[in-house]
Design a protein with these regions (language model features):
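Short helix-initiation/N-cap motifs at beta->coil->alpha
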Residues: 68-70, 128-140, 177, 268-278
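Bacterial Sec-exported substrate-binding components of ABC uptake systems
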Residues: 19-94, 197-232, 355-392
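Alpha-helical, coiled-coil/dimerization segments enriched in small aliphatic residues
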Residues: 242-272
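Bacterial N-terminal signal peptides
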Residues: 9-18
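Extracytoplasmic ligand-binding site segments that recognize negatively charged/polar headgroups
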Residues: 109, 114-117, 157-161, 175-186, ...
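Structured C-terminal subdomain patch of bacterial secreted/periplasmic proteins
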Residues: 186-191, 197, 297-392
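Bacterial N-terminal signal peptides that target proteins for export
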Residues: 1-8
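A short, structured surface patch at a secondary-structure boundary
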Residues: 84-143, 149-155, 263
Length: 392
């Protein structure tokens, strides 16, 4: 019995010693702290410093985006390889780049330039490393970039968009053609990038400036609204042509919002720019004429027109109200992000008494700072030298 007790004690001691020497189980790693669920809305001070804000964590099962065609597109997480494609791309790109995530999320894009230049390289230090697509790139070329989202204007849906959808590439359509569409499409991008705070900030930037103009012009009677004409000058092909925009385009909406009366509203307008004769321009004899020139220096065009005897007979020329539309990298009349500058500038030209002290250079600097994080030095060197048109 005594021997058995001794053996038992010895056996127990061996077992305890073995347990003490055995390797300990590695504890399970703790989960990393969750990413911030709200992105800061402030834009960094300089383009080079613009960093993507932390995207909100998508809800379980992902999130759904409703685009300009009322389609719903579901994502499991914010897209990391975005492609911008289709026609009229630069207008869409400029809006997308108001989100600081854009620079790192966009993997490939088509041409973002126009006749007067290319803005995106000024604000995206990584622009040269992105895949450059041809303007007529098809679905296969776009798919080769392996995007998890393609963004394009809805006008491309029936052609390029349909082909991408057929091979299961997620496509989100936007318009960015009118003030109302800007509010809607910014909200769409806010959901897509999971940065709704930034979408609200940019939308508020636009709305506050529209409200400032409409408040100033709200009490005007029709007789107090100058008869106004917007003309697109084009001499491509060696023949000079003047064109007026459709009633639903941003140029017409600018005139109406800025407190003017578009004289071409009863013309036989098409879906795009409509050519008009000099005889028709003379018949309208508008109080104020705004000249747009996308592929010519607008100041040179205005100088040429003022020297023409036929134009010298017009009321607007006699009263020094023939204006070259304000332009920097792109013209401010287009449905590019700069339309808000164009609206403010036009209102100041039509009703200088309602906008005393309006300084469009200051307005432009605020625009680039608030929407693109461009500091004063960069604005002075990259934007201000390009500012042309009737801007004092």
């Amino acid at each position: 019995m005594h021997r058995f007790r001794v053996l038992s004690i010895l056996l127990l001691a061996v077992m305890l010693t073995s347990a003490a020497c055995a390797p300990q189980a590695t504890p399970a790693p703790t989960a990393p702290p969750p990413a911030p669920t709200q992105a800061p809305t402030a834009v960094p001070a300089t383009p080079a410093a613009v960093q993507p804000t932390a995207a909100a964590a998508p809800a379980a099962g992902g999130f759904t985006v409703t685009d300009a065609l009322s389609r719903t597109v579901t994502f499991s997480q914010p897209p990391q390889k975005v492609v911008l494609a289709g026609k009229a791309l630069f207008m869409v790109a400029d809006a997308i780049y108001t989100f600081p995530e854009a620079g790192q999320r966009i993997a490939a894009l088509g041409s973002t330039g126009q006749g007067s230049g290319n803005f995106i390289p000024m604000i995206d230090p990584g622009f040269s490393s992105k895949i450059s697509l041809k303007s007529d790139a098809g679905a296969e070329q776009i798919a080769a970039a392996q995007p998890d989202c393609v963004i394009m204007k809805s006008s491309n849906a029936a052609t390029l968009g349909k082909s991408l959808e057929a091979i299961n590439v997620p496509v989100v359509y936007v318009d960015f053609e009118t003030p109302d569409q800007y509010q809607r499409d910014l909200k769409t991008l806010g959901t897509l990038f999971q940065n709704e705070d930034r979408a609200k900030t940019v939308a508020a930037f636009y709305q506050s400036r529209v409200d400032a103009v409409t408040k100033a012009t709200a009490a005007l009677t029709d007789d107090q609204k100058p008869r106004t004409l917007v003309l697109y000058y084009n001499d491509q092909g060696g023949t000079v042509a003047f064109n007026v925009p459709p009633m639903g385009w941003i140029q017409t909406l600018m005139v109406q919002t800025a407190g003017g009366r578009p004289v071409w509203k009863d013309a036989n307008l098409g879906n795009g720019w409509t050519k008009v004769t000099l005889e028709q321009i003379a018949a309208w004899d508008a109080d104020a004429i705004f000249i747009v020139a996308y592929f010519n220096p607008v100041n040179d065009v205005v100088t040429k027109l003022k020297a023409d005897p036929q134009w010298q007979a017009l009321k607007a020329v006699k009263n020094n109200q023939l204006y070259g539309f304000a332009t920097d990298v792109y013209s401010w009349d287009e449905s590019d992000t700069r339309w808000i500058l164009g609206l403010t500038w036009m209102a100041g030209k039509l009703h200088p008494d309602l906008f005393p002290g309006l300084d469009m250079k200051t307005e432009a600097q605020t625009f680039y700072q608030d929407l693109y994080g461009m500091d004063a030095t960069t604005f002075q060197s990259n934007i201000l030298p390009k500012l042309t048109g009737d801007v004092p």
